[in-house]
Design a protein with these regions (language model features):
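Catalytic beta-strand/loop module used to bind and position nucleotide/cofactor moieties
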Residues: 96
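Membrane-anchoring alpha-helices and their flanking helix-loop junctions
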Residues: 1-93, 105-174
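Histidine-centered phosphotransfer motif of kinases
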Residues: 99-105
Length: 174
């Protein structure tokens, strides 16, 4: 992260993260969709695929927003965006009670939606690259969080899935 952002007020930090997310998850897929190939035939199936794609984009954006809002609400008073990738607190509420990585899951959903909408190989390739990066980063972050939070994070690892929510195990209360 840039040094100038180290002590930025959190509202300004949220705005900068939002602008970055729009660039990464809207502008980049659009530009990739313009690479090579002719326009595909139009018709009811295409319209349905685009509609489903746009719904997937909206769902992913909503999940990302919910995750960001959970961080905003959980941040201690006086907290400012700093250069660490992970905050100084363990967040277990909001979407983080269902998935350890709701931001990545939301981002992947946005890219999946654009891939369905644009139906271009370059956008599908972008989705694959994003998913591979998210998987690698999530494993790296888990090691850092285990070091930082110890047993609390180990419990969280056992209770909450990495990506998608799962049903409770039989005989256990949630």
């Amino acid at each position: 992260m840039l040094r100038c952002m180290k002590r930025m007020p959190r509202t300004a930090g949220v705005l900068i993260w939002t602008l970055g997310a729009v660039a990464m998850h809207a502008v980049v897929p659009f530009e990739l969709s313009r690479l090579g190939g002719r326009a595909r035939p139009q018709g009811p199936a295409t319209s349905a695929a685009r509609g489903a794609g746009l719904l997937t984009v909206a769902a992913g954006a909503a999940l990302m927003t919910w995750a960001l809002a959970a961080h905003y609400q959980a941040a201690p008073r006086g907290w400012a965006l700093d250069s660490r990738l992970t905050p100084g607190y363990l967040l277990r509420r909001g979407p983080y009670r269902l998935s350890r990585n709701p931001m990545y899951a939301g981002e992947a959903a946005v890219w999946l939606g654009w891939a369905r909408c644009y139906r271009r190989p370059a956008v599908w390739a972008g989705l694959a690259i994003q998913c591979a990066a998210f998987a690698a980063i999530a494993r790296w972050e888990e090691q850092r969080l285990l070091t930082r939070f110890g047993g609390d994070y180990q419990d969280y690892l056992q209770q909450v899935p990495r990506w998608a929510p799962r049903s409770p195990k039989r005989g256990t209360a949630r």
